[in-house]
Amino acid sequence: MNDKRLRRRSQYRVATVGLALLGLLAGSGFAAENKLSQKSGKVLMPIGDATEAMDTLYPFFRLAEEGYEVVVAGPETRLYHMVLHEVPPNSDVPWDITREMPGYHIKAVVAFRDVKPEEYVGLFLSGGRAPEYLRYDKDLMRITKHFVKENKPIAVVCHGIEIIAAAGGLQGGRRATTVGKCELDIAQTGGVYVNEPWVVDGNLVSAGTWHNYDTPFFKTFVHKMRESAVR
């Protein structure tokens, strides 16, 4: 076997191990770190098949860095398929909507029906196609309504707005932003769509897409959770 083939095999093994490690970290909920971070509280992250990868993985690790235990919940406790959503920047035929591609996998460590929302200090609703059908889950609606009623901090990005909208969390003219094609989900459920990268209205912090994660979106969400903890 020549040197070139050996190098190629070695590179393949390294890449495979790297991807496996990333999947393990996501699937385990960063358990080792989280055991040390429980003093800051737990943040619930509902997901399902077709949850957007960037929407989800960045906050998963970012909030853990702030000392929070990020608990991934789903309809059942199993691995879920994430996807990548992107409008192709260079295409011979223009796209008017995002193209969907397969992404990583992430494990839900608790089912919606077993979630006790009073145990959590914050709720993070990510995007992708998953919210389109997750909003029909009665247990997820029960969970989301708890955060709305108790005025606990809620962060939402992109299509995640469909979940809080379905739970009645935008009634009374609450201001929020989202990806443009979800604007009606805000307006038709009593909210006010604001065409800005990120918006704050009380306990609700919203961002249009993951492209807006470079705003004070995360700092504000974390600040609100810390404020809530001392009340």
Report the location of each language-model feature.
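Active-site-adjacent substrate-recognition loops and nearby beta-strands
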Residues: V179
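Bacterial N-terminal signal peptides
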Residues: A15-A26
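ADP-ribose/adenylate-binding Rossmann-like module
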Residues: P153-A155
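Bacterial N-terminal signal peptides that target proteins for export
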Residues: K4-T16
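Short, thiol/selenol-centered motifs that function as redox-active sites or metal-ligating centers
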Residues: V157-G160
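Extended, subdomain-level signal for the structured scaffold at the beginning of enzyme domains
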Residues: A31-E150, E162-R175, E183-R231
